[in-house]
Structures are given as C-alpha cells and as structure tokens.
Amino acid sequence: MKRYNLLFKASFFVFLLLLIQGCSEQVQKKMRVNSEFASYIGAYTSGMISKESTIQIQLTEDYGEEINYESPIEANLFDFTPSIPGEAWWVNSNTIEFRPDELLASGQQYEVNFRLSALMDISDELEVFAFNFSTVNQNFMVYADGLSTSDFSDFKKQKLEGRLVTADLADSLNVEKTLKAYQNGKELTVSWIHVDGLVHRFVVNGLLRKKKQSSVKLVYNGGALDVDESFEEVFEIPALGDFKVTKMDIIHEPEQYVRIHFSDPLKTDQVLKGIITIEDVSNLRFSVEGHNVNVYLPNRVA
C-alpha cells in the first residue's frame, strides 16, 4: 500500500463553523423596548425564529382572572405587521402563545403590538407593548460524503452519498426538486431520507466506474425552496484499479479525527501504522469503515 503522509501539523486544525444564516445579507433591526415593561413582561419572542414558530409573551406574574385553556383567547391581543392570521392561547398561568394558521414567510421581519391593557389595568404609556422578530431567510448547503462501492463484489457499481441541509424547515418534495445528477449526460436516480425538516440525506445511485476516469455532475436549483441560487458540482470517478485518496475531512464532534476517503474499500484488518502518518505526531489510532480510514490523534487539538 502506498504511504500517505498528512502534511499538516496539529496547528492546522481550525474549527470552521458554517452558519447557513450567514449566507444571507438579512439583518434584523431590533426595536427598542421601554424598560418599564420589565415589571410586567418577563420574556417575549424576539430575534431570528423559524417560520414554523409560534409567538409568545410571558408575564412576570400569573394572570389574576380565570383562564380557559380549552379555547382561544377572545380578546384581540396581537396586531402584526405584516398581518398574521391565527389565534392566541393561554399556555400556562402567565404565558400567552399566538399560533399562526399557516407557516410564516421566510426572511420576513414582523412588527408586533401586544395589547397589555386588555389583561390588566396599566398606565397609558404602557398599554401597548411593541416588539419585533424576523424569520430565517431560507437557504441551503450541500455536503457530499464521497463516492463508495455499492456492491463489494463489483467495483464498477458506485454511489454518491451526501446531505442537503436547509436553514429553515423545508417541504420534503421541494427539497427533492433541488437536486439532479448526471453521468455522461444521463440523469441518475436520487433517493432520499428526510431526517427532519432541516437535514435531508441523499444517495445518487447507478454510477458506473469505468476503465478510464469519468465524472458525475450534481446540479442544484433552489427555486422550489424559494432560494435564488443555482450551482453545479462535479465529482471525479477514478478509473478501475486506480487506488487513491479522493477526499479528506477533519471531524471535531463528538470526537476529533481525520477522515480519509479512498477510491476503494479497505480491509477492516488492514495494518495502517507507518502507512498513514501525521508530521510530528505519534501514537495514532485507526479505524476502517468501508472506503474511510479514521485517524485519531492521541490528544485533542484546539
């Protein structure tokens, strides 16, 4: 087996936090709130929220009158700009929750007037509590795990696995419309597992590894998610018999290690000591998972 020297020192490990929200230029302007409201309102919905969220107001003290938890509140407590149809409900003795009839609009800032005077006798200047919040601007990022052999008895049969992560809740069918895969101009089948409304795992099936190097093209179009972004990614499919490193990642959680992806699967009992090294680092541990070799350092590096 060829010797692989990972040419980076421990200081190379840098934790890169990718915030999908950071891809957007959306900026929320938080409304200044009169500090005197702190005597009556202990918490409220603010900042950036999901489009599936409710809007809550938490009073500092229990409401002094009888509460009906089985029906929406009759009083018109909330006024939204832009308008949000829905109903207000008591959650407990000091928390009111507005439940929208539909999902909120993505990337929208809302201004709210809450009629505090409908719940208690209060001075004129504190009758209406004004605040605001914004919904997450929808976006998505794609992480490809790399090519792997779908049938260990036939290395010609390949698949490409990955995941598409949305910034906010997304409909599964709309997510599936964002990705198409092609090899030599032929569209390939993509299967999906929707972990939740945010993480969507995909597998591109039917890839063929040939005697000569080829490629697979992934085409992304965010139109179905109301995201104005389209792009392509091309992944090399090594020729049959061409054994090499195709991808390398640094994993930080829950345990820190280097994941090296090879063009062919490895034997689980493959001896790797002396074959894979990290400069100036000894006592490495290894584990083999199909095409991947996980390389663990003796100490966690910041």
Regions found by a protein language model. Give the residues of each.
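Bacterial N-terminal signal peptides
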Residues: A10-Q21
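Intrinsic disorder/low-complexity signature
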Residues: M1-K2, Y296
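Acidic, low-complexity Ser/Thr/Gly/Pro-rich repeat segments typical of extracellular/periplasmic
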Residues: C23-A302
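Bacterial N-terminal signal peptides that target proteins for export
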Residues: K2-F12
